[in-house]
């Protein structure tokens, strides 16, 4: 009888040891939950609201500052203002209010959205409030302009991402990437938005370096 009990104990020892080892080392890697998207915040620390209007303000001061505004593109024959510019200084006029239109839900970092100048306008000029990007052969770059569409697979999609310095950066991220944006070369086929000089005005454009650092102030 004692011999049988002894043999039974010997059989149970490997099971106990295996169970203890398995539990302590946690050999099964359970799938981790995806991190929640981070909401984009305004200058007061509030989450951006698709139903609200905001001014896009540069982080810089003096000649490095200035709000983003809607203006007439040089040499343009468009019937309405069709260019996206930045004022030459933070001491001056306020920028043109915009609203951010996400594909769904709230406004989060690194997610596709449309941008629209939120101003009263005549029917003819409604599409000239929606941001897009177009090629400028003279400057050999792609400029931000208006005349886009909302919710369509074209040249009108952007993202807001956290800046490596202060505030946020804007990215241009077309869905039909290779055709519409030869400048979009990062992993997500997006391009940074910065500033170039066009006939004495600071024009928003796609850049390889020195992106525009901005914040959003509710109107």
Swiss-Prot record:
Keywords from the UniProt entry: Aspartic protease inhibitor, Disulfide bond, Glycoprotein, Protease inhibitor, Serine protease inhibitor, Signal, Stress response
Record site feature (Reactive bond for trypsin), residues: 99-100
Cleavable signal peptide: 1-23
InterPro entries reported in the protein's UniProt record: Kunitz_inhibitor_STI-like_sf, Prot_inh_Kunz-lg
One Pfam family matching this protein: Kunitz_legume
Bilayer-spanning residue ranges: none
Top-level taxon in the UniProt lineage: Eukaryota
Propeptide, residue positions: 24-32
Keyword Mitochondrion belongs to the record: no
Tissue note: In tubers and green buds of untreated plants. After abscisic acid treatment or mechanical wounding is mostly accumulated in leaves, to a lesser extent in stems, but not in roots.
Glycosylation sites per record: 51
Disulphide bonds in the chain: 80-125, 173-184
Site (Reactive bond for chymotrypsin): 142-143
Recorded family membership: Belongs to the protease inhibitor I3 (leguminous Kunitz-type inhibitor) family.
Function recorded in the entry: Inhibitor of cathepsin D (aspartic protease) and trypsin (serine protease). Protects the plant by inhibiting proteases of invading organisms.
Protein name from the UniProt record: Aspartic protease inhibitor 10
Source organism per UniProt: Solanum tuberosum (Potato)
């Amino acid at each position: 009888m004692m011999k049988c009990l002894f043999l039974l104990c010997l059989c149970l020892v490997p099971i106990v040891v295996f169970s203890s080892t398995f539990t302590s080392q946690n050999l099964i890697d359970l799938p981790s939950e995806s991190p929640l998207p981070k909401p984009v915040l305004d200058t007061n620390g509030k989450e951006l609201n698709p139903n609200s209007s905001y001014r896009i303000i540069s982080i810089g001061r003096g000649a490095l500052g200035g709000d983003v505004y809607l203006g007439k593109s040089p040499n343009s024959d468009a019937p309405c203002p069709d260019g996206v510019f930045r004022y030459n200084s933070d001491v001056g006029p306020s920028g043109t209010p915009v609203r951010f239109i996400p594909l769904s839900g709230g406004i989060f970092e690194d997610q596709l959205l449309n941008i629209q100048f939120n101003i009263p306008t005549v029917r003819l000029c409604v599409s000239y409030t929606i941001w897009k990007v177009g090629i400028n052969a003279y400057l050999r770059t792609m400029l931000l302009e208006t005349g886009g569409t909302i919710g369509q697979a074209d040249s009108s999609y952007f993202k807001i991402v956290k800046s490596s310095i202060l505030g946020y950066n804007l990215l241009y991220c077309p869905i039909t990437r290779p055709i519409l944006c030869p400048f979009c070369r990062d992993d997500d086929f997006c391009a940074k938005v910065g500033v170039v000089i066009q006939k004495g005005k600071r024009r928003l454009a796609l850049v390889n370096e020195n992106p525009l650092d901005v914040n959003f102030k509710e109107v």
